[in-house]
């Protein structure tokens, strides 16, 4: 349920523990306990945003700019998304998109 709410609200950059607890009808302490193994609420939200960005980048019909994608998944800017993506996945979004398209084309 927490993941579903985050996924629906990805573009909302004000999404935080308080609003997530309200939307999921969980107490803040319960929510924080649930996501503690993932580094806390903020880290969990960022991970969901990064996974959404990775999914979109892997799609062969993806044509949005990095700035548009950043906005869609709740990052403040393309550079913020790019840095977070590199930190999390070990490659830049453009590198990932190229690799995903090359891999998809080899089947």
For the regions a protein language model found, what residue spans apply to each?
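DNA-binding recognition helix and immediately preceding turn/loop
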Residues: 1-42, 58, 62-73
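Short, basic, alpha-helical segments at the C-terminal edge of helix-turn-helix-like DNA-binding modules
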Residues: 19, 45-55, 94-107
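Short hydrophobic/aromatic patches on the structural cores and recognition surfaces of FHA
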Residues: 31, 53, 81
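Residue-level detector of secondary-structure transition/capping positions
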Residues: 39, 49, 61, 89, ...
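Sequence-specific DNA-binding recognition helix
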Residues: 61-99
């Amino acid at each position: 349920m927490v993941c579903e709410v985050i996924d629906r609200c990805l573009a909302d950059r004000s999404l935080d523990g308080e609003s997530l607890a309200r939307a999921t009808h969980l107490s803040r302490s319960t929510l924080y306990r649930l996501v503690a193994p993932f580094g806390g609420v903020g880290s969990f939200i960022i991970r969901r945003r990064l996974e959404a960005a990775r999914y979109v980048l892997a799609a062969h019909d993806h044509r949005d700019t990095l700035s548009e994608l950043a906005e869609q998944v709740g990052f403040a800017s393309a550079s913020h998304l790019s840095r977070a993506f590199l930190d999390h996945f070990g490659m830049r979004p453009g590198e990932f998109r190229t690799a995903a398209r090359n891999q998809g084309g080899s089947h």
